[in-house]
């Protein structure tokens, strides 16, 4: 434990119930981006970091990620982002954001060495019943 009261104050002043609900429902992509960049704070700090990214405009109010801008915000480095349609996880070696789709819904997970290495949810129907459809290949410029 470090400064729980300070964290409580930060949450109260920076996260409206609406913002927290948006991050809860749609923040998977942002959390996966953090993981793929090797940024692995505790869960509370991750939520606060996503909120900071929204305030900075590198993530939209609906949690849509502006990939290159978000990478620069988080790392201070320029990154190229390639959008790639996929049908399987095969061949994805480095940490890669991957979107799964199922019945009109989507969910993002982090993949490494062809396997899911990080899922921001304990379980997801999109992952369990759906299929991978899209990846974001992140490369330092």
Question: What is each stretch, according to the model?
Answer:
Residues 34, 38-141:
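Conserved active-site-adjacent core of cysteine acyl-enzyme catalytic domains
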């Amino acid at each position: 434990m470090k400064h729980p009261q300070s964290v409580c104050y930060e949450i109260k002043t920076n996260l409206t119930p609406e913002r927290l609900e948006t991050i809860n429902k749609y923040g998977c992509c942002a959390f996966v981006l953090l993981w793929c960049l090797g940024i692995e704070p505790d869960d509370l700090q991750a939520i606060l970091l996503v909120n900071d990214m929204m305030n900075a405009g590198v993530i939209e109010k609906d949690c849509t990620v502006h990939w290159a801008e978000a990478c620069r915000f988080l790392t201070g480095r320029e990154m190229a982002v390639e959008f790639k349609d996929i049908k399987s996880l095969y061949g994805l070696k480095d940490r890669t954001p991957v979107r799964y789709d199922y019945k009109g819904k989507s969910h993002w997970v982090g993949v490494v060495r062809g396997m899911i290495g990080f899922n921001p949810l304990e379980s997801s129907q999109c992952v369990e019943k759906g299929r991978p459809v899209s990846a974001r290949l992140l490369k330092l410029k």
